[in-house]
Amino acid sequence: MLRNSRIVLLLFTISFTSFAQSGKLEKGKESLKNSSSSASSSTSSPNSKRSSKSSNYTDEDSTFGSFFGELFIKLFAYTAYGVLVETPFEFKGRMHDAEIAHFAYENSTHGNFIYTDFINYSNVRFDFTNNFVMENRNLYGNNFGLDFRFLKRFSVDFGYLYVTEKSNLKRDYFSLYSALLKYHRIRTQNFDAWFGLGIMYIGCDVNKTSFGVGLGGELFVKKPISILFSHKWTNINNEEVHNTKMLLKYHIKKYHISSGYEHFKIGVSKINAFSVGVGASF
C-alpha cells in the first residue's frame, strides 16, 4: 500500500512539474509585464560644509569660453549632419539625385535605386513582404511587412510579427507591431542602407508601446540575387525586444522569393527561426 502511494505521488510530481514548465513565449511575455522596480537610492550629498565659491570669471574668460563652446556646437552639428544625412562630397555625387527604381533589378545594373537624369523617375513605391518563420514544429508564425518609399530617400515601414507556440497542451501567442520612419542614408545602385525611428507595440496580454529604432541594408550582388539585413529594437520595462532578419532574396521582375534566418528576442526568451517568404513591389 505504501509503495503504491509513493508511485502515485511520484507520477503526480512529474506531471505537475511538466505542466509548470512554461514555453518561450510565456516566459518572454511575463518578463516584459513584470516591470523591474529599480530601487532609487536617495543620494545624500554632504554639501553642508561646502563653501560656495563665487565664480570670478572676467569678461575675457566668458568671451573665450563662449567662442569655443559655439565652435564645438557648430563642429558637432556639421559632423552629425555629414554622418547621418549627407556630406559635401556626396551632395555633388550621383547618389544625391538617385531615384527610386520601380522594382529591384529592373535592369541588371541597379537595385532599389537608379542613377538617371529623368525627373521623378518613380515618385513612390510600395514593397510588400510576408515570411513564414519556424523554430520547431511547436513554435512558428508570420512576419509581415509593408514599406512605403517616397521623396527618393525616405520610407515608412510597417511591420507585424505574429508567433504562436504549443507547450504543455496549451497554445500561447505573441504579436509585435512596428512603425518606423526610415531615412535611406546610402542609395547606390548596388547597396541600400537605412536607419529609422518610430514606435513598437506588443499585444497579447503585454499591451505596451515603446520607442523603437531600426537599421538595415540590402546588397545587390548580381541579378537576380540580393542579401538583406534588418534589425529593429525596443525596450519594455528594462527588457529588450529584437526583430532581426538575414535573408537571401531571388528577384523575378516585380516579385521575389526569400529564405534565411530570423532572430527574435522577447524579454528573457530568444527564438532562432528559419524563414521563407515572398514579396512584391508596386
Protein language model regions, located:
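Histidine/lysine/aspartate-rich catalytic loop segments that bind and position anionic ligands
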Residues: 190, 195-226
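Outer-membrane beta-barrel translocator/channel fold
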Residues: 160-179, 184, 196-210, 230-282
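Transmembrane beta-strand segments of Gram-negative outer membrane beta-barrel proteins
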Residues: 67, 71, 112-132
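Short, surface-exposed loop/turn motifs at beta-strand boundaries within globular domains
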Residues: 117-123, 135-141, 149-151
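Outer-membrane beta-barrel channels and translocator barrels
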Residues: 151-153, 186-190, 220-224, 252-255
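Cleavable N-terminal export/targeting peptides
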Residues: 1-114
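Charged linear interaction tracts used for macromolecular binding and regulation
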Residues: 111, 116-118, 186-189, 204
